[in-house]
């Protein structure tokens, strides 16, 4: 039996929950969980904000742990290996996206917390292809958020062929944005942070931003007209997108990684005349995750985390929901 924590209904508190996972599949890995990040997507699933939640719901998709068991078809990890698991717990492996290496775009990809019990427990299972071995030297306590927040901002840097000479702005310096700033600085880019938090300004500079602009001040935003080659938006609220797009240089690219549920209100003419573009992306493939982890270790990039024990799980969730979390929250089974 696997001991976990589950929401039994929308907006419900998490409760102890046991389930029998059945026989381990030939292509499955069972992970003994050491740490698991708490992401805003977990909150959305607990509260059924996206209308895709099934209860009992065991959240948790930023898993770090050791391989406890594996099926006979798994050969890239061994029992005892340190591994991580992110948003996806499996892929079809036969569609064009999978065969092209874009597993994260697989139309039938299995989510770790949608119709599947996630990592808020002592163990979790997933298809082997979605389980990524951790590189030596990585900090285990802070590695979990890299499997969602980290790859969410790193993947478009790879897919958009971001040049190290680019001028890049990040909207929102929270769980995603503080990682984007670190990755972009290490990539070689000139980084500007749009933030509404006066208290974060010194810290954002320490994380690697070259410039800061007040996102609550339209004049400050407008002062950057035509400046940026890329903008990465990490926020989940509606903003004046046309004002931000005015800060793109010709052929500039605006990329969404934060989930904004409201329809976008965009003026086409500035996009057309400046050959500017708008796009979005979800997480990344296992191969890109592995590349990101190596890059993070090489450049000493770490999520800033606050740690709670698993028996404080509802306290941790309330802390994140309140907006008081210092970037990322991680649950721990560690005795330390």
Curated annotation (Swiss-Prot):
Binding site for Zn(2+) 2: 92, 95, 98, 106
GO cellular component, one term: cytoplasm
Record flagged with keyword Disulfide bond: no
Cofactor(s) annotated in UniProt: Zn(2+)
Cofactor binding description: Zn(2+) and Co(2+) are equally efficient in vitro, Fe(2+) is less efficient.
Domain of life of the organism encoding this protein: Bacteria
Entry keyword annotation includes Cytoplasm: yes
Substrates-to-products reaction catalysed: a primary alcohol + NADP(+) = an aldehyde + NADPH + H(+)
SUPFAM superfamilies the record matches: GroES-like, NAD(P)-binding Rossmann-fold domains
Enzyme class, UniProt record, top EC level: oxidoreductase
Record's note on what induces expression: Induced by salt stress (0.5 M NaCl) under control of rre1 and hik34. Transcription induced by 0.5 M NaCl, 0.5 M sorbitol, heat shock (45 degrees Celsius) and benzyl alcohol (a membrane fluidifier) but not H(2)O(2) or high-light treatment; the induction kinetics are not all the same. Response to all stresses is mediated (in part) by two-component system rre1 and hik34. Expressed at a low constitutive level, protein levels increase 2 hours after sorbitol exposure and 8 hours after NaCl exposure (at protein level). Protein levels do not change upon heat shock (followed for 24 hours).
Sequence similarity: Belongs to the zinc-containing alcohol dehydrogenase family.
Subunit structure comment from the entry: Homotetramer.
Protein's name according to its UniProt entry: Aldehyde reductase AdhA
Lineage: Bacteria, Bacillati, Cyanobacteriota, Cyanophyceae, Synechococcales
